[in-house]
């Protein structure tokens, strides 16, 4: 028999004999799928969690929500590379997701899940489960994800395939920049990163406390790769990566605008790419979301991220939204001729 529950108590979930291990680093190979990530979002970013859980025997399906003004939405923010449901590997797990969709219809008429991947089938799985349960699903591209699949290449082989201007920059500027790659958290280096970030082209940091807590935890677990670049003894560029499950994740990077002429960001990136490829032996690198032009110099694949708007079509509150959506679609068709 399928049991369905909703909880805001993440400590209770952590102590659960089935869910605690399922949502731990032992079972999940990316930080965004773990309970610790959601706990940090709650503690530092003000996102109140609501976990929707369906379970039967040793199988479970978990949809991590936070409540927005229009209903549940993905428990995620700008630090999250992608959002997806977490399921056990048993054959009953997809049916549990459908059971959740049916139960959610009792109390909600609209759910928005942004940042969903589909290279792993996640968006399609959620769409199918909710449609079977009587929901309408509207899928739209909302972001892009730049990635690199190494396919056995070492760093030098990878570098030889980079654009000529980038390789020229690295050849000319590498001798002018001193770089270090740390595999542990260092408070002094982190302070330098925060100082560099404040003088960079980047917008104001959304939650410095979240980022530092994450870096400290990843450092303690041995997954942190913290890069720092100096010119003339002054720290001028810094980057934060993590490595796990055969993938390196590029979380943050910044350089001082005053040092732009010596390309410290590119030189530091090269050092980190070399480290994760030749030392950590990763099979892939994930540059997160956003279509920044510089990502194309380093990455080779672009994957879409989707927003799923899940709607109960019979709910009157959804009719204006559905009418506007239909008009937008008609306008697109008319524009195509």
Regions found by a protein language model. Give the residues of each.
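A gly/proline- and charged-residue-enriched helix-loop-helix capping module
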Residues: 78-119
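Active-site/acyl-donor-binding loops of N-acyltransferases
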Residues: 2-9, 66-67, 124, 128-157, ...
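A general structural signal for short secondary-structure junctions and capping/turn motifs
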Residues: 42-44, 102-105, 136-139, 276-277, ...
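Short catalytic-loop micro-motif centered on adjacent basic/acidic residues
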Residues: 111-114, 180, 284-286
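A conserved beta-strand-loop-helix scaffold within acyl/acetyltransferase catalytic domains
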Residues: 2-73, 116-145, 149-261
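Short glycine-enriched loop/turn motifs at secondary-structure junctions
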Residues: 21-22, 78-81, 280
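Short, high-confidence coil segments that cap the C-terminus of an alpha-helix
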Residues: 47-49, 106-110, 224, 279-282
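Aromatic (often tryptophan-rich) hydrophobic motifs at membrane interfaces
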Residues: 98-102, 201-320
